[in-house]
């Protein structure tokens, strides 16, 4: 199990990203627009830099819904390989069976 504080911090970051998404997208569009004057683009860059860092999408870490483990994460199932194996062996994940040939 992951530390509760790490899981909660990630949830807080997801919330912050959702709140800041439109503002960040607008500022990034201004920064990337080559037809605008360099002064306006620079001001937009400064505003973007002044926003909270946790509002950036790259700060989010995919974590297992069951254990909170940050590595070996399967996106489709939203769980780690260890949780998948345990739940799959106990028959709690539909469509997952132990292979044999």
Curated annotation (Swiss-Prot):
Region entry Disordered, spans: 1-21
UniProt-listed Gene3D superfamilies: 1.10.287.1480
GO molecular function: rRNA binding; structural constituent of ribosome
The keyword Ion transport belongs to this UniProt entry's keyword annotation: no
Recorded GO CC terms: cytoplasm; small ribosomal subunit
Function: Binds 16S rRNA, required for the assembly of 30S particles and may also be responsible for determining the conformation of the 16S rRNA at the A site.
HAMAP family per record: Ribosomal_uS14_1
Homology family: Belongs to the universal ribosomal protein uS14 family.
Record's protein name: Small ribosomal subunit protein uS14
Gene (name only): rpsN
